[in-house]
Each structure stands twice: as structure tokens, then as C-alpha cells.
């Protein structure tokens, strides 16, 4: 039986702070209205991800620091923000981004394996985490067709039946796409 994992990027914040901006809270509520029920709900340990989860309307059941830890060598590679095909090329290089992507996919697999057949889990994480994890989860997919960088509250919906099988790119309503603020 299929299981579903939805992985979303956090909402926009009021920089330089970590707290979501009012527009970010509104955007998270739009996601809530289209998402349905999730169990479990997992977040990175970064406050903006936790607060996005709450703004979407869910209690954070589990916090995984690795969903928010970007290794220095991955950050220094300067890959993000970037389209899925650019991230795919970085993942294919078998360097730090490849290892990072594989780690995200392993975390996601561990989460989806915990849910019952027919269940859905939500992960709230960060830019590049979404793109890299999705690419590593479905390495044979046509990543170029997946589009540009994931914006705030956007993400992927992956189906799982022993392995990840299908990836649907999740967008916010037209006119609300924003990668950086």
C-alpha cells in the first residue's frame, strides 16, 4: 500500500530574524487549506521551520536537527538557490552535495517507513534540502522537468511503496512564489 511524504520549505521570515513574517504566516495557512491530515509531522530544529509547521496548523511531533544542518562544504559550494537540473548536476558530482542529498533521502525514507499504509507524513525543512533530497530519492527521474528552485512553503509530494516512486512538485498559488526575501 502506498504511503505519502510531503516535504515543504519553511515560510518567509523577517530578516535578519528567525521568526516568520506576517505574509509568511498567511502563506502557510494557504498550504494548510490544501494539505489534509498528516501523521507524523517532522521539522528541522530551526525556529522558522518549527513555526512554519505550527502556522500550517500542525503540532511538531518530531524534530530532526539533520533536516536543518547544512554542512559548511555544501554551503560553500554555492549551489542554492538553483533549479532542480542545476542541483542534479551538483549531486551527480559525487562531492559534498551528493553525500548531503543521500543523507536527506535516508532521513526521508526513515520517516515514511514509520507511517502506516495509506498514511501521510509532513516534513518542514529548508531550500536545497528539498531539491537535493528529492533528487536523491528518485535518481532516475527527469529532474530538469521539475522546474526552478523551491520557493517558500513549496515542496514535493513523494509516493512510497518500498521505495520512492513518484514526485509531484508542490507550488503555492500563482503570484505567491518567492525564493528569497
Say what each PLM segment does.
Residues 3-8, 42, 115-129:
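Beta-strand elements within well-structured catalytic alpha/beta cores of enzymes
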Residues 2, 69-79, 117, 135-181:
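Acidic, low-complexity terminal tails and accessory targeting/binding regions
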Residues 86-118:
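Internal catalytic-core helix/loop-beta-alpha segment
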Residues 53-55, 134-137:
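Short amphipathic alpha-helical segments
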Residues 13, 129-130:
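Short active-site segment of divalent metal-dependent hydrolases/proteases
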Residues 46, 50, 105, 127:
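Conserved glycosyltransferase catalytic-site signature
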Residues 10, 126, 174-177:
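Histidine-centered active-site/metal-ligand motif
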Residues 1-64, 70-71, 78, 87-97, ...:
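Active-site-proximal alpha-helix that buttresses catalytic centers in soluble enzyme cores
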Amino acid at each position: 500500500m502506498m504511503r505519502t511524504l510531503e516535504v515543504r520549505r519553511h515560510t518567509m521570515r523577517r530578516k535578519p530574524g528567525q521568526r516568520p513574517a506576517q505574509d509568511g504566516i498567511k502563506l502557510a495557512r494557504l498550504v494548510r487549506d490544501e494539505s489534509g491530515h498528516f501523521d507524523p509531522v517532522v521539522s528541522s530544529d530551526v525556529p522558522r521551520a518549527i513555526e512554519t509547521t505550527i502556522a500550517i496548523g500542525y503540532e511538531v511531533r518530531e524534530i530532526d536537527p539533520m533536516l536543518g544542518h547544512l554542512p559548511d562544504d555544501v554551503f560553500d559550494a554555492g549551489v542554492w538557490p538553483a533549479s532542480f537540473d542545476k542541483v542534479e548536476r551538483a549531486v551527480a558530482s559525487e562531492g559534498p552535495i551528493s553525500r548531503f542529498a543521500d543523507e536527506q533521502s535516508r532521513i526521508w525514507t526513515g520517516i515514511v517507513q514509520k507511517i502506516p499504509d495509506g498514511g501521510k507524513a509532513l516534513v518542514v525543512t529548508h531550500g536545497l534540502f528539498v531539491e537535493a533530497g528529492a533528487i536523491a530519492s528518485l535518481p532516475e527521474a527527469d529532474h530538469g522537468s521539475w522546474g526552478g528552485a523551491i520557493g517558500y512553503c513549496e515542496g514535493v509530494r513523494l509516493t512510497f511503496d518500498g521505495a520512492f516512486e513518484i514526485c509531484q512538485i508542490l507550488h503555492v498559488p500563482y503570484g505567491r512564489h518567492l525564493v528569497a526575501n
